[in-house]
């Protein structure tokens, strides 16, 4: 749709030679509407869905984490978490159509979607680094994960490894405190790793994932839920342009003084190439 409107908009602009430098051409007005629709109906709605789904996944992992301590993890708990993970992952893949703005400026994509997962590092964490795992189990576990784990252990793929095996949900008993991992490949034997430790890791990493997604959401939408904005402020994470404007406002006001886009067509171009 943007491509079609861009063609007609540019044609309209080229036929509007009488417009003065202080006027907005009819073509640019049309393109501004396209940009506003893209921000409101595509980018913001996608990030909202992603934020909601990662929050639900985080809450479900909290349930499993708590149940793990009493060896009470059920298969339904794990299956529900896997369903929520798939939904969150699908929302993220939809957002990859516009990895620009905040996603690029704050390096969020590599932070939450680096591949492959470093299984050797994960083994060393879960089997050989009990002090760090215990730090991940604190109230600020997501912050500890963000600061200490590195991109190869953060994001979707680390959580996926804990929840799934060979594309299907893990056996629930493996995620209990008295459970052990059945993974034993390529010289990495996770059987000495407790299910409780795995859930501590997954829950902390999911907290960091959720916070990173909240950063995407609040960066584009100045009307994002206040609780999400409060989390950004409490973590002292930047989530706006240096002007203080949201990325959505900045794009909607392309060509207007204060926007980083010098013209409407520059903003359209950024959308089409997914950059800027």
Protein language model features and the residues they cover:
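Sec-dependent N-terminal signal peptides
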Residues: 1-5
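Mature extracytoplasmic or organellar-lumen-exposed domains after removal of signal/transit peptides
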Residues: 20-276
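Bacterial signal peptide processing site
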Residues: 14-17
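C-terminal motif of bacterial Sec signal peptides marking the signal peptidase cleavage site
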Residues: 8-12
């Amino acid at each position: 749709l943007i491509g079609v409107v861009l063609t007609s908009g540019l044609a309209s602009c080229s036929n509007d030679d009488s417009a003065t430098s202080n006027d907005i051409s009819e073509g640019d007005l049309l393109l501004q509407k396209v940009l506003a629709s893209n921000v409101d109906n595509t980018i913001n709605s996608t990030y909202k869905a992603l934020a909601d789904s990662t929050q639900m996944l985080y809450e479900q992992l909290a349930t499993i984490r708590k149940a793990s301590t009493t060896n009470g993890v059920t298969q339904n708990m794990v299956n529900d978490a896997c369903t929520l993970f798939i939904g969150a992952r699908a929302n993220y893949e939809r957002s990859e159509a516009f990895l620009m703005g905040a996603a690029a400026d704050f390096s969020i994509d590599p932070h939450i979607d680096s591949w492959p997962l470093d299984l050797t590092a994960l083994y060393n964490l879960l089997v050989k680094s009990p002090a760090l795992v215990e730090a991940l189990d604190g109230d600020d576990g997501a912050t500890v994960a963000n600061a200490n784990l590195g991109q190869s252990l953060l994001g979707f793929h680390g959580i996926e490894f804990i929840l799934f095996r060979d594309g299907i949900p893990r056996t629930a008993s493996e995620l209990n405190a008295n459970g052990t991992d059945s993974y034993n490949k390529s010289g990495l034997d996770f059987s000495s790793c407790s299910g409780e430790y795995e859930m501590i890791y997954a829950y902390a990493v999911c907290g960091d994932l959720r916070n990173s997604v909240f950063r995407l959401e609040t960066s584009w939408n100045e009307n994002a839920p206040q609780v999400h904005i409060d989390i950004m402020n409490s973590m002292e994470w930047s989530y706006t342009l240096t002007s203080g404007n949201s990325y959505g406002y900045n794009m909607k006001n392309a060509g207007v003084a204060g926007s980083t886009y010098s013209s409407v067509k520059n903003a359209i171009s950024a959308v089409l190439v997914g950059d800027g």
